[in-house]
UniProtKB/Swiss-Prot annotation:
It comes from Rickettsia rickettsii (strain Sheila Smith). Keywords: Cell membrane, Heme biosynthesis, Iron, Membrane, Metal-binding, Oxidoreductase, Transmembrane, Transmembrane helix. Its EC number is 1.17.99.9. Catalyzes the conversion of heme O to heme A by two successive hydroxylations of the methyl group at C8. The first hydroxylation forms heme I, the second hydroxylation results in an unstable dihydroxymethyl group, which spontaneously dehydrates, resulting in the formyl group of heme A. It catalyses: Fe(II)-heme o + 2 A + H2O = Fe(II)-heme a + 2 AH2. This is Heme A synthase. It comes from the Bacteria. Its cofactor is heme b. It is found in: Cell membrane. It is a multi-pass membrane protein.
Amino acid sequence: MQKSLITKWLCINCIMVIATIVIGGITRLTGSGLSIVEWRPVTGILPPFSFESWQSEFAKYKAFPEYNSVNYGITLSQFKFIYLLEFIHRLLGRITALIYIVPVIYFYFKDVIKNRDMLPYIIALLLFCVQGFIGWYMVKSGLLNSPYVSHFRLAFHLIIAVIIYHILFYQLIKNRCDILLIPSQTDFKLPLIFSGIAITVVYVQIFLGALVAGLDAGLIYNSFPLMDDRFIPMEIKDNFFDLKNWYDPVFIQFIHRLVGYSVFLVVVVLIICLLKIEHPKLNKIAYFLMIALFMQVSTGIITLLYSVPIIIASIHQLFAIILLSVIIWCYFLIKSF
């Protein structure tokens, strides 16, 4: 009974974290992230209701660089759209944190979660507590002289969310999945190594994807597989190792492509390793990996070719999480044996 309760709670948390990540991506893609210029963790749980309240929020927004440099002259109705997107993202983050924090404290004191199992839950709790601060730290970078948030802070904010999801999803499958019964002579060394490598490169790729979004690097070189008929674009060919390149959208897009190829190759090798084991559950994971990889690669290419359509770009981000989830599931099953 207790195990079932924990499983359902973790499942709800995983869904909520994914939803928050996707809404956060849409908020970035629509340029809505700087529409709320204050951080009020408690009093900010309700949106403006009256016309006067909306006018007050709009007046605050007009005092910051984004209005004057990017959105000068927008109407109140247009402001409401971007404001509500950012509001929903923040509200969803608060709700997700509450759904996690309150039950985990209850489960601990009621001994539903044993002391020996508490470490990952405590780490997730701490990350939930700091994530709001990190989000505001990111937003604050776009409220100073430049109307654009730091792409590094944006990537850090996303990676913390992904780490939270990783911890919760791992605990979910730990509660839900049975250990595989496979003959002892089966060699798991290669699939274990490649599942670990796959998790690492997907994390790197998600981080790079956030840098691409932060610099609007998806709006340039909208061709595939080459960048203006070149593998390495001219802008970075002669100064490839310059640290300043990490502020250059051309370089960031190139590295995102490069790591994307690495993700594809590593996951394909992992799929081959799983199919060679000839176990129904691992074979099923291999097929799930094929689907997730295909969707991730195809939506990424479409996002690039069509200059970042919001729906496709959001699906691309979603499938990055789905691909990561399947690899984590694979890693757990192999490691548990």
